[in-house]
Amino acid sequence: MILSDKDIFDYVNSKRVLIEPFNSKFVGPCSYDVTLGSEFIKYKDDVYDLKKNLSHNKFEIENSIMVCPLNHHLDETIIENYKEKYNVDCVVSGGLLGTTNEYVELPNDVCAQYQGRSSFGRVFLQTHQTAGWIDSGFKGKITLEIVAYDKPVILYKNQRVGQLIFSKTLSPADIGYSDRKCSKYAGQKSVMASLIKKDFEIDEEE
């Protein structure tokens, strides 16, 4: 059962669902809009070896970032020209990780799904790849996987980037996501790189 606007207000007001900060203007008919934070991660590895720690740079923006497609040629001169012409803090090509401003806590009988905004899809910008599912009992900020597929796109800190759709489960989970020992991203309050390496460690322990 998907929560309507009335349900979302009820769950937030009764503190069964926590959204911090909460803006009543961001409540839709059956969703809640979330906004872009200031922290990002850009991977440095030429190859993603998923059994190893992934090398990356973590950085912050003051106002805006230009996201270019992977095959978009960038060099120092082009980057500086883009920064000056479009007044952006940072210019990157390829995929990068971002995070929402919003910190969310779900009870064990509510799960959620993140969806990118249709307006972004219409300029061929995706803000999540496969990680749109949020398990019951999750606590933390939502990580975004950002890719531009056509032309460079300028994103602004604090702009609405997607929405959360909340669903009531038939029964509460016995162990919520953030209470499971093997949950890798429980309580995340900042952008986090992939911890898939830990999957292999868990398998070896078993």
From Swiss-Prot:
Site feature Important for bifunctional activity: at which residues? Answer: G132, W133
UniProt catalytic activity? dCTP + 2 H2O = dUMP + NH4(+) + diphosphate
Q: What does this protein do?
A: Bifunctional enzyme that catalyzes both the deamination of dCTP to dUTP and the hydrolysis of dUTP to dUMP without releasing the toxic dUTP intermediate.
InterPro entries under this entry? dCTP_deaminase, dUTPase-like_sf, dUTPase_trimeric
Query: Tell me, which GO biological process terms does this entry list?
Result: dUMP biosynthetic process; dUTP biosynthetic process
Q: Transmembrane segments in this chain: where?
A: none
Q: Which Pfam families match?
A: DCD
Tell me which family the UniProt entry assigns to this protein.
Belongs to the dCTP deaminase family.
Ligand binding (dCTP): R117, S118, S119, F120, G121, R122, D135, T143, L144, E145, Q163, Y177, K184, Q188
Q: Which UniProt keywords apply?
A: Hydrolase, Nucleotide metabolism, Nucleotide-binding
Record's PANTHER family? DCTP DEAMINASE
Record Gene3D superfamilies:
2.70.40.10
Q: Which residues form the active site?
A: E145 (proton donor/acceptor)
The answer on whether this UniProt entry bears the keyword DNA repair reads: no
Record the organism.
Methanococcus maripaludis (strain C6 / ATCC BAA-1332)
This enzyme's EC code(s):
3.5.4.30
The top EC class is hydrolase
Which pathway is recorded for this entry? Pyrimidine metabolism; dUMP biosynthesis; dUMP from dCTP: step 1/1
Q: What is this protein called?
A: dCTP deaminase, dUMP-forming
Which GO molecular function terms does the record list? dCTP deaminase (dUMP-forming) activity; dCTP deaminase activity; nucleotide binding
The subunit structure is: Homotrimer.
HAMAP family in UniProt: dCTP_deaminase (MF_00146)
